[in-house]
Amino acid sequence: MGRKIVVALGGNAILSKDASAAAQQQALMDTAKHLVKFIENGDQLIISHGNGPQVGNLLLQQSAGSTEENPAMPLDTAVAMTQGSIGYWMQNAMNQVLKEKGLNKTVATVVTQVEVSADDPAFTNPTKPIGPFMSKDEADLAKKENPDFTFVEDAGRGYRRVVPSPKPIGVVETDAVNTLVDAGIVPISVGGGGIPVVADGNQLLGREAVIDKDFASEKLAELVGADALIILTAVPNIYVNFNKPNQKKLEHVSVNDLETYISEKQFAPGSMLPKVQAAIDFVKATGNEAVVTALDNIEGFVNEGSGTVITKKVRQQA
């Protein structure tokens, strides 16, 4: 039996410039054609995904249509709603591609709650970007209409709303995910970072936050005993001195070296930094490898090991 692998999809795997349902379903069909490479390779696949654009758009719709009789849903419920919609699109796309390939596998979405601490400092310091990019004028108008919202500039690409992003400390449905994997089913889990909940006695109480999907994927990978965590993004490798004349591609890199690069502020917060931090956390917790690469490099990774591979120590080159 192949390796158990958690693959975390980036937003570009779901959403193009067209935010319609049809366009997102088509994007996921293209994504599924790449992901099936793992199954063809004999790997046990667990899929996770982000929801930043989708949950932000949903909140805008909720806010615009909110009335006393039909109030807007809170953020934790909006996360659950996007888990359902994206999971529906993803499992249909995967099941179609699996049938076309003659592979006897099926895919199922797990509505997943992720436990966080009620005392997490993130609740008083919102940093997680969600929703569409806006111009400064658009962000100022949205702030005027929604005084409780916070907007910041995101990696030089425009302004976005930011919300609390607490760190995951547990995944409630871990056993359900493992049961599906053991039954030969491909689970989709911790969508959008999971629904943030805090434990209160026998209750799990939702919180208005969005957990970073890379940290949630790392926690899931750790808890299910994954052999590898693969974080997909828009570029095939992690780079230092990114977009500078002395840009350097990282292929095999140690945790210690990555931590040095973090101290040098090589990675943009809210962009590459959480992916690197999640990869480090997984390698430290398990001793197994983490990989950061692009969706369209999956075949290259499966066949040749290309991408950025993070291990405790740098491998000796042959």
Curated annotation (Swiss-Prot):
SUPFAM superfamilies in UniProt: Carbamate kinase-like
Biological process according to GO: arginine deiminase pathway
Keyword Ubl conjugation (UniProt): no
Location in or out of the cell: Cytoplasm
Domain of life of the source: Bacteria
Pfam families given in the database record: AA_kinase
Keywords of this entry: Arginine metabolism, ATP-binding, Cytoplasm, Kinase, Nucleotide-binding, Transferase
Chemical reaction(s) catalysed: hydrogencarbonate + NH4(+) + ATP = carbamoyl phosphate + ADP + H2O + H(+)
Annotated EC: 2.7.2.2
Primary location: cytoplasm
EC class of the enzyme, as a word: transferase
Signal found in the keyword field: no
GO molecular function, a single term: ATP binding
InterPro entries: AceGlu_kinase-like_sf, Asp/Glu/Uridylate_kinase, Carb_kinase
Name the record gives this protein: Carbamate kinase
Native species: Lentilactobacillus hilgardii
Gene responsible for this protein: arcC
